[in-house]
Amino acid sequence: EGGSNVLQRMWIVDFAKGLPRLAEPLFRQHFGESCCHEYFTRCGEIGFQANVRHEGRVEGYNCFVRTDGTWLRQFLLPGARPGHIQSNSDNTLIIGDSGCLAPDDSEGRAFMSLIRHENGRGIVTRLCRHDTSWKTQVSHPHPIFSPDDRWALYASDAGGACNVYMADVTSI
């Protein structure tokens, strides 16, 4: 955990090699790349978000690698990436705490979104408004799927105090 603008953020230790104190880069970052909000999927993959500076703009991606660092796939998002994401049980759907539909979509940060991956692109659908203030770490939505993938659970301080909310993923 820490800042995303570091030379190398994601590391792994392979205990099978017998060198438990030797950390190696899991995903080698290049100049102009940053990654953050790493998580293990229920399928055993590692999901994360990446920003890549390209032709004067920043492109946001959802990415997946194996625990040995083998690159699996990446998906370009249509606008700013969500702050936090999680995958459903079979990695076919991602829940995110913003739903930007275009690079200039300023309202998107107030929405929970469902993201499907098709042909190298993230297809964003807004699920519901969370309207959190983002003032504290506790007020960040940090969305997750319920074990049966039917519900999206998230936090918000929209009512004046942080509460946990549920939205029916099957409603859209």
PLM regions: where:
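Blade-level signature of beta-propeller repeat domains, shared across WD40, Kelch, NHL, RCC1
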Residues: 139-172
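Surface-exposed loop/turn elements that mediate protein-protein interactions on large endomembrane-trafficking
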Residues: 12-22, 61-75, 115-125
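Blade-terminus and WD-like Trp-Asp/Gly-His loop motifs, strongest in beta-propeller folds
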Residues: 1, 37-47, 85-94, 144-151
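Beta-rich catalytic cores
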Residues: 6, 34-36, 58, 81-83, ...
